Amino acid sequence: MTAPFRENNRAAQKLELINKICTYLVFITYPVYVLYLCFTAGHMLALSIIVPLVGFIAVSVFRYIVNRPRPYEKFDMPPVIPKDTHGRSFPSRHVFSAFIIAFTVLICSPAASPLWFTGILLTVLAAIIACVRVISGVHFISDVVGAFVFAAIEAYIVTVFFL
């Protein structure tokens, strides 16, 4: 899956650029969203901070315990996106973070509001990040699917028990 990108430097650079742009967009939007909540919907502020934080910690601990090798370790091939981390592949914390931020914006925003549409855009960006992480050889498909499932379960629990 990574061969076309490892064999074509321009394609690899474009893939890395897509990864950086999507990641930066998600992780710049989140603090702007939290800042916006400080001035408008304070009742959702704590939830919007706690949900991603708790999930991030839980996924980090889970990854440490599982310590699954990454594709570039297992298949002894260089990743397309520079990465030298060993183990801790499942679930993808990068993808989990993008999805839980997107889901948090969705569940804490009124339906069909501009913020809700921002949540939809963030979900699309998270999906692109997931694809790029697999195509670049830094995660298995199951790593990014697992990250999505972890984020979806956390968002569901928050929706059922806290909203």
Where are these regions (language model features)?
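Hydrophobic alpha-helical transmembrane segments
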Residues: 1-3, 40-44, 64-69, 88-100
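Membrane-embedded catalytic cores of phosphoryl/pyrophosphoryl-handling enzymes
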Residues: 76-163
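N-terminal transmembrane-helix/juxtamembrane module of multi-pass inner/ER membrane proteins
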Residues: 1-30, 59-87
